[in-house]
């Protein structure tokens, strides 16, 4: 039987064969060269269409060809370069429990319509939420399909719940929302949240991390118990600043003391803590903001594991917008924001990760303030120009260093490193495997001796593993794709063994508990761990 290809198929096959030919010859296939190949094939096959997208090209490739093509054509490798595929899902609009901050643009009945609190409806995740009427199942399913179309592995998913103070919602809504996200990953409608979690432990798309956003005053024992029940591994706190007078003026509805207490409770429950920080709030200035960052990284009451930094912006429909119109407030200029954030980066400890710089708000809705969405890139350029180095996790992760700088780790110089510090009344030990010659981070583990835990699983004989992460491009759980990856090479197991040794020999503990993502529980079972309440645990003999 003779198969006759249409003209579009001929074009796609031409592009695929050219790429594979150059790949086999060892030629460089960057984004520019791929576009050149598309143009060359379009000149041969004149069919009146523009440059085909990479996802279109992949549809015409065989399964064997895809193994080579996907790593080459993958758009935005940074989406999975830290080791997981991020899926952000937006909750439905709901009024904030405390009222409205003076800089908050969104919410029910805002100038942007009914959108989630603190969003404008123009952010990618919010638009996806609106498109699917904030249905968690449809949002999750669509995002996974979107990531797969552009070549990202989606075996390991970090699920981020956005849209406001999730713990303030009804318990029934919270349980239903997470269950439906898991149903979308599992491809099966479970009868309960617990069943959905159990299925996900061995599903094709596993939830290896679950992040929930909340406020410091909605992060007490009750809220933490619920978040752990849902399967949370990280909590993002809307801290904004550590000055009470500014928090009060901006109508935040919480205090610095709330932040300190929430931070301690979260760490003593084995959860990772991320701070959202907003330099340039009304009443602050550059000197105060620099002091804030120094205090946050040095004062044991704070010391978060991660930070998101976004300068205060003026957006229509806010109380801050009216102040700005009256000349009572002026946000940071671009160069001021760059200087402040560069300073923050310069003093970050090696155990902190910068997860985001700048909100995902389009410039078209920003009335005044930093409008550039690539503020992070501008910060890095400024730092490079002024010889400023950052030691944070993101800047040293193997995936980012290889992708951004083209530097491969030297295996001979990969060593086990240890940094110990006091935080929130307890002792933190940051263990890592690093290329000490090139300052590249391969894998790390956060071990904690708790201060005042309230969970019944955690007693005086317990140490907590709050995070275990191997950096680098996500490696599928199947072993099909032959890519350069640092996952599945035993670094995680070695770090866990060292954590067990430290807990037993140095601290005299008899038990170790790991805050495991739902989809990572099987990994820990293979290492001798079993379910202990919300955790995976092991008794140290």
Curated annotation (Swiss-Prot):
One of its GO terms (biological process) is tRNA wobble base 5-methoxycarbonylmethyl-2-thiouridinylation. Pathway: tRNA modification. It comes from the Archaea. Signal peptide: none annotated. It is an enzyme of class 2 (transferase). GO terms for cellular component: cytoplasm. Keywords: 4Fe-4S, Acyltransferase, Iron, Iron-sulfur, Metal-binding, RNA-binding, S-adenosyl-L-methionine, Transferase, tRNA processing, tRNA-binding. Disulfide bonds: none annotated. This is tRNA uridine(34) acetyltransferase. It comes from Methanocaldococcus jannaschii (strain ATCC 43067 / DSM 2661 / JAL-1 / JCM 10045 / NBRC 100440) (Methanococcus jannaschii).
């Amino acid at each position: 039987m003779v198969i006759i290809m249409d003209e579009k198929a001929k074009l796609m096959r031409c592009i695929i064969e050219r790429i594979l030919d150059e790949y086999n010859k060892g030629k460089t296939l960057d984004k520019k060269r791929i576009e050149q190949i598309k143009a060359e094939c379009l000149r041969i096959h004149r069919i009146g269409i523009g440059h085909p997208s990479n996802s279109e090209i992949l549809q015409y490739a065989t399964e064997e060809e895809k193994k080579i093509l996907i790593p080459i054509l993958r758009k935005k490798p940074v989406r999975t370069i830290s080791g997981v595929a991020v899926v952000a899902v937006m909750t439905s609009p709901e009024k904030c429990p405390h009222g409205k901050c003076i800089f908050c643009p969104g919410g029910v009945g805002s100038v942007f319509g009914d959108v989630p609190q603190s969003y404008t409806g123009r952010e990618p995740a919010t638009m996806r939420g609106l498109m699917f009427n904030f249905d968690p199942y449809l949002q999750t399913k669509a995002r996974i399909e979107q990531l797969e179309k552009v070549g990202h592995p989606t075996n390991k998913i970090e699920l981020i719940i956005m849209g406001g103070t999730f713990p303030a919602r009804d318990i029934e809504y919270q349980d239903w929302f997470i269950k439906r996200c898991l149903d979308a990953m599992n491809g099966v409608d479970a009868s309960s949240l617990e069943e959905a979690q159990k299925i996900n432990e061995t599903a094709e798309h596993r939830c290896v991390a679950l992040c929930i956003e909340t406020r410091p005053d909605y992060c007490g024992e009750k809220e933490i118990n619920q978040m752990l029940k849902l399967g949370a591994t990280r909590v993002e706190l809307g801290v904004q600043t550590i000055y009470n007078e500014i928090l009060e003026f901006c109508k935040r509805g919480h205090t610095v003391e709330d932040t300190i207490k929430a931070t301690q409770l979260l760490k003593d429950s084995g959860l990772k803590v991320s701070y959202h920080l907003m330099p340039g709030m009304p009443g602050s200035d550059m000197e105060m903001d620099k002091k804030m960052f120094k205090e946050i990284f040095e004062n044991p009451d704070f010391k978060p594991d991660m930070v998101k930094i976004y300068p205060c912006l003026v957006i229509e429909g806010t109380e801050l917008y009216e102040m700005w119109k009256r000349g009572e407030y002026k946000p940071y200029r671009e160069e001021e924001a760059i200087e402040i954030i560069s300073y923050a980066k310069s003093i970050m400890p090696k155990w902190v990760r910068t997860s985001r710089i700048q909100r995902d708000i389009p410039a078209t809705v920003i009335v005044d303030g930093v409008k550039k969405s690539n503020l992070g890139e501008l910060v890095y350029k400024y730092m490079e120009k002024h010889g400023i180095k950052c030691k944070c996790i993101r800047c040293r992760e193997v995936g980012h260093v290889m992708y951004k700088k083209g530097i491969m780790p030297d295996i001979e110089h990969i060593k086990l490193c240890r940094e110990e510090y006091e935080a929130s009344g307890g002792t933190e030990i940051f263990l890592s495997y690093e290329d000490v010659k090139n300052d590249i981070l391969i894998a790390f583990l956060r071990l904690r001796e708790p201060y005042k835990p309230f969970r019944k699983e955690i007693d005086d004989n317990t140490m907590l593993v709050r995070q275990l992460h191997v950096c680098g491009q996500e490696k599928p759980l199947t072993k099909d794709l032959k890519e350069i990856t640092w996952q599945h090479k035993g670094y995680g197991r070695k770090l866990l063994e060292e954590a067990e040794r430290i807990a037993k020999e140095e601290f005299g503990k008899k038990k170790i508990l790991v805050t495991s993502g739902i989809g990572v529980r099987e990994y820990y079972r293979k290492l001798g761990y079993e379910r202990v309440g919300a955790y995976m645990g092991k008794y140290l003999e």
